[in-house]
């Protein structure tokens, strides 16, 4: 499945608009528990489906609450995307938790511990 230039442009525009909608228009208190960032959008080749990857800063409870809030707001966000972007078909949106930032942070902490000598051979 090759990613076309058109799909890349649409995905980038969707990413920007979804971030704006979540930040400015979704009034769900569950989204205020953790800082929500849209990290990427992956479109199917026919542009009928979109996976929206989000990173949520906060503890496990804040992440769960924010994901519930996003699930509840999905139809509103999809409707807004349909009005803002001139697409033939507004994709069905699925939110996915992106843990790559936390994973990278964990690796950085491990590397810092190795540099500090915590894992030196005895």
UniProtKB/Swiss-Prot annotation:
<dbReference type="InterPro" id="IPR020053">
    <property type="entry name" value="Ribosome-bd_factorA_CS"/>
</dbReference>
<keyword id="KW-0963">Cytoplasm</keyword>
<protein>
    <recommendedName>
        <fullName>Ribosome-binding factor A</fullName>
    </recommendedName>
</protein>
<comment type="function">
    <text>One of several proteins that assist in the late maturation steps of the functional core of the 30S ribosomal subunit. Associates with free 30S ribosomal subunits (but not with 30S subunits that are part of 70S ribosomes or polysomes). Required for efficient processing of 16S rRNA. May interact with the 5'-terminal helix region of 16S rRNA.</text>
</comment>
<dbReference type="InterPro" id="IPR000238">
    <property type="entry name" value="RbfA"/>
</dbReference>
<dbReference type="InterPro" id="IPR015946">
    <property type="entry name" value="KH_dom-like_a/b"/>
</dbReference>
<dbReference type="GO" id="GO:0005829">
    <property type="term" value="C:cytosol"/>
</dbReference>
<dbReference type="GO" id="GO:0030490">
    <property type="term" value="P:maturation of SSU-rRNA"/>
</dbReference>
<dbReference type="GO" id="GO:0043024">
    <property type="term" value="F:ribosomal small subunit binding"/>
</dbReference>
<dbReference type="InterPro" id="IPR023799">
    <property type="entry name" value="RbfA_dom_sf"/>
</dbReference>
<comment type="subunit">
    <text>Monomer. Binds 30S ribosomal subunits, but not 50S ribosomal subunits or 70S ribosomes.</text>
</comment>
<comment type="similarity">
    <text>Belongs to the RbfA family.</text>
</comment>
<dbReference type="Pfam" id="PF02033">
    <property type="entry name" value="RBFA"/>
</dbReference>
<keyword id="KW-0690">Ribosome biogenesis</keyword>
